[in-house]
Amino acid sequence: MVSATPPAPADGRRVALLTLGCARNEVDSEELAARLHSDGWQVTTDGEGADVVVVNTCGFVEKAKQDSIQTLLAAAETGAKVVAAGCMAERYGRELAESLPEAQAVLSFDDYPDISDRLGAVLAGTAIDAHTPRDRRELLPLTPVRRGEAAVSLPGHGTPAAVAQPGARSAPIEVDEHTPAHLRPVLRRRLDTGPVASLKLASGCDRRCAFCAIPAFRGAFVSRPPEALLAEAEWLARTGVRELVLVSENSSSYGKDLGDPRALEKLLPQLAAVDGIVRVRASYLQPAETRPGLVEAIATTPGVAPYFDLSFQHSSEAVLRRMRRFGSTDRFLELLGSIRALSPEAGARSNFIVGFPGETRADVAELVRFLEEARLDAIGVFDYSDEDGTEAAGLSGKVTTATVKRRYDRLSALADELCAQRAEQRLGSTVQVLVDSVDGGVVEGRAAHQAPEVDGSTTLVAPVGGGVDLTALRPGDLVECTVTATEGVDLVAVPDAMISAAPGVAR
C-alpha cells in the first residue's frame, strides 16, 4: 500500500497548510503538499512550530472572508511567516496584501507550480509582489473543447502536465519501485488519513448566476481527463480511501469540454470498479443539467451512492430568473420524483438563499411549499448579502436587513424541523454505513444519504444477540445496519452484517 503520510525529510523546512472552505480547497492543499514535500519541506496541518504557515483561504461570502482573515492573523501570532493562498487571495490579490501586512505574501493560483520557490523566498525575506486580480475566464478559450490546450494553472488537477507552467518544476508524489507507472504522475499527498477523500472532477464554472463571483476567480469550466481521475482514484484507494466524493463547481457539466456531455455517466461505474473503493458520491449537481441518464446512473449504479446534492438555491420561478437560473417548485419536485422512482431511499440535499433582491412574501411562500413537499435530507439556508463584482449587487429591489434576518430565521427553523422529520422516516430501514471513526468505543459513520461534514452522521450501537461485534469495527468498514433511533438529522443504527471490511487493518 502506498503510504498516505511518507516520512518527512529530517532536515526539511517546516510548512503548515491550513485549509478553509470547501472540499475543492482541500484537494488543492494536497496538491501543494505534494509539491512541497517532494522539494524537501516538512508538511503539516499544525501551525505550531512551522517556519511558514500557508492559509488556503475561502472567498465565497463575507463570513468566509472574515474567517480567512482571522485565521491569517492567528497564524501571524505564532511567529511564523504567513502566506495567503486560495480563493480569497486570488480574488483580491494586491488589495488583500495592502490591507493585511501580517501576511508576508499573497499568492495567485499561477504561483502554485512554483510554490516551493515562493515559500523559500518568503523565508529568505524576499518581497513577493502580489498580483493584480483578473477575470480568470478570460485566460481560457471561449470554446470549451479548446480549453485543454491552454497553459493555465488549474489547482487540484493532479498531474504535472496539467498544471505546470513553462519553466516550472513539476513535483510528483513520492513513489517507489512498487508504484505502477500510471500512478507516478499523480500530484497529491494526503493530509488526512481517514477513509474518505475528495476527487476533483473539474475546475471553474460557465454559468452566470447573478449572486456568484466564483467564475471570475476560478475561471471557466475545465474537466480533468477520465484517465487522470481513474489513476488518482486508484492511488487514493492504495492510501486507504474507501469512499470518493466527486467535487467541482458544477459536476453535471463534466465532460462537455472533452466532447462528451455524458462523460460522468460513463465515469461513475469505472470509479466504482476501482479496487478498494466501496462508495462513489457525486456532489455539486446543477438541477438544470441533471439529465435523466445521469439520474439513472447515480440512482442505480452499484457502488455509487444514490445521493443527489442539487443546487436549487430557490424554488420561486421569478426569483430564479433574477438569479439567472432556471426551474420552479413543480419542476424541482418532478426531478425529485424521477429520482425516487428509481431509488425510493435516495438521499437529497440542497442549499437555498433567502432575501435575494426582489424576493417577495409570495416567493417565500413558494419556497416553503417546496421545502415541505421535497423531503430533503439536508437543507442549508443562507441569508443574501451583496458580493463584490456580482450582478446581484447592482440589482434593484433590495430586501431590508431586518426582513432578510426574519426570513432566514424562519426558513432555518423550518429546515431543521423538516430534516429531522425526514430522518425519522428512515426508522427501521436498512442502511449501508461506512465507518469513519472509532474513538473510545464510539463508532461513527455515514449512510449513503450522508455526505462528509454537511449531512449528519450515523452512530452505531451494540446489537442485542447476533449481528456484528461493535468492538471489531474499524474505519473503512462498510456495514449493513438497521436504523433504530434518530437525533435531529443524525441516525442511530445497529450493525447487522459486514459488507466489506477495510483491507490491511489489524483486528
UniProtKB/Swiss-Prot annotation:
* Residues of the TRAM domain: 424-497
Q: Which InterPro entries match?
A: Elp3/MiaA/NifB-like_rSAM, Methylthiotransferase_CS, Methylthiotransferase_N, Methylthiotransferase_N_sf, NA-bd_OB-fold, Ribosomal_uS12_MeSTrfase_RimO, rSAM, rSAM_horseshoe
Q: Start and end of every MTTase N-terminal domain?
A: 13-124
* Binding annotation for [4Fe-4S] cluster 1: 22, 58, 87
What keywords are annotated for this sequence in UniProt? 4Fe-4S, Cytoplasm, Iron, Iron-sulfur, Metal-binding, S-adenosyl-L-methionine, Transferase
Q: Which residues form the Radical SAM core domain?
A: 191-422
Q: Which residues bind [4Fe-4S] cluster 2?
A: 205, 209, 212
Q: Write out the GO MF terms.
A: 4 iron, 4 sulfur cluster binding; aspartic acid methylthiotransferase activity; metal ion binding; protein methylthiotransferase activity
Q: Which Pfam families match?
A: Radical_SAM (PF04055), TRAM_2 (PF18693), UPF0004 (PF00919)
What GO cellular-component annotations does this UniProt entry give?
cytosol
Using the UniProt record, give the first listed, main subcellular location.
cytoplasm
Task: Say yes or no: keyword Transmembrane helix present.
Answer: no
What does the Swiss-Prot or TrEMBL cofactor note state? Answer: Binds 2 [4Fe-4S] clusters. One cluster is coordinated with 3 cysteines and an exchangeable S-adenosyl-L-methionine.
Spell out the reaction equation it catalyses.
L-aspartate(89)-[ribosomal protein uS12]-hydrogen + (sulfur carrier)-SH + AH2 + 2 S-adenosyl-L-methionine = 3-methylsulfanyl-L-aspartate(89)-[ribosomal protein uS12]-hydrogen + (sulfur carrier)-H + 5'-deoxyadenosine + L-methionine + A + S-adenosyl-L-homocysteine + 2 H(+)
> Could you tell me where this protein is found in the cell?
Cytoplasm
The coenzyme or cofactor needed here is: [4Fe-4S] cluster
E.C. number = 2.8.4.4
Family the entry assigns: Belongs to the methylthiotransferase family. RimO subfamily.
PANTHER family attached here?
A: RIBOSOMAL PROTEIN S12 METHYLTHIOTRANSFERASE RIMO, RIBOSOMAL PROTEIN US12 METHYLTHIOTRANSFERASE RIMO
* Role summary: Catalyzes the methylthiolation of an aspartic acid residue of ribosomal protein uS12.
Name of this chain's protein: Ribosomal protein uS12 methylthiotransferase RimO
